[in-house]
Amino acid sequence: MGLAAPRKKTKISHDPNNTSWSRSTDGFGHRILKAQGWTPGDFLGARNATHSDLFTTASASHIRVVLKDDTLGLGARPKRDLLDGPTGLDAFKGLLGRLNGKSDTQLEAEQQKRDDAKLARYAATKWQTVRFISGGLLVQEKDNATASPASQDLRVDFPRETSSNEHENGMFKTEPMDSYSHQEGCATAREEEGKKKKKKNKKGKEMDMSPRKSREKKQEKIQKKRKIGDCDRLDTETADRTSTKVLVAVANDKGTSLLASNGPSTSRERQPMGRRIFRSRHIEQKKRALMDDKSLNEIFMIKT
């Protein structure tokens, strides 16, 4: 009921079962029923009816009103504790069994059955629809056989970083053969993609493939597109690395004469990448100028 609903206050009367009306003999209902041949304690309806066999003593009793204070549906029984039974009933049954001449083994077997039934009822109330099933043991699976060749082709081996001695000498080692083979694979993938596009543009091609074949073909196309995208990304990364390596080599060649006087550096500095290399080059030149006595004298205009 919302806030805009009509507010109705209901009160439970002092006679909710309406026994005062049923007991009174002065009312119109009691008088008309007596006029029709009804007497107190009899059933309502014809005595020779087809459902007369279903009448019980409850049919002659009063209709009782039950207050519904829950959200259960009509006819639903409220949840009650199955273990909430009469206490001491098991011991009383055992006593009756001894009086009937049963042995102790029979009594123990019956008691065990009752205990098992009690545990089963408790489990049914505690875990209603849960069934514990053994799932076995976990076994490690071998992924080497299931690895697809497409995932193996996409493996990229980046070239290792050059050491400080190689930077000083201005020598750079070539990339390993894995990257070269990967570039060849990228080129072949591009050629295959170009051939497929040419075949697709041809007229008169029949498109009567089954849904499964078309699905497999779409998956192959997606894998090849991913492979070509990885190849393009690898090419751009290698081009950026080569450009930065050339700039580092030029900067190192300019400062080899100054570094030779101070001796070889023991600590390895991190080489900047990208647009920061130009700023780092100017910072290195300023550091070298401050380390050199002659350049300091020129800065402070001191004549020697």
From Swiss-Prot:
GO terms for biological process: rRNA processing. Residues 15-25, 256-266 have a biased composition (Polar residues). Residues 154-170, 204-238 have a biased composition (Basic and acidic residues). GO terms for cellular component: nucleolus. The keyword Transmembrane does not apply. Residues 25-79 form the G-patch domain. Residues 1-25, 144-238, 256-276 are annotated as: Disordered. PROSITE patterns: G_PATCH (PS50174). GO terms for molecular function: nucleic acid binding. Keywords: Nucleus, Ribosome biogenesis, rRNA processing. Residues 1-11 have a biased composition (Basic residues). Belongs to the PINX1 family. Involved in rRNA-processing at A0, A1 and A2 sites and negatively regulates telomerase. PANTHER family: G PATCH DOMAIN CONTAINING PROTEIN (PTHR23149), PROTEIN PXR1 (PTHR23149:SF31). This is Protein pxr1. It comes from Aspergillus fumigatus (strain ATCC MYA-4609 / CBS 101355 / FGSC A1100 / Af293). The gene is pxr1.
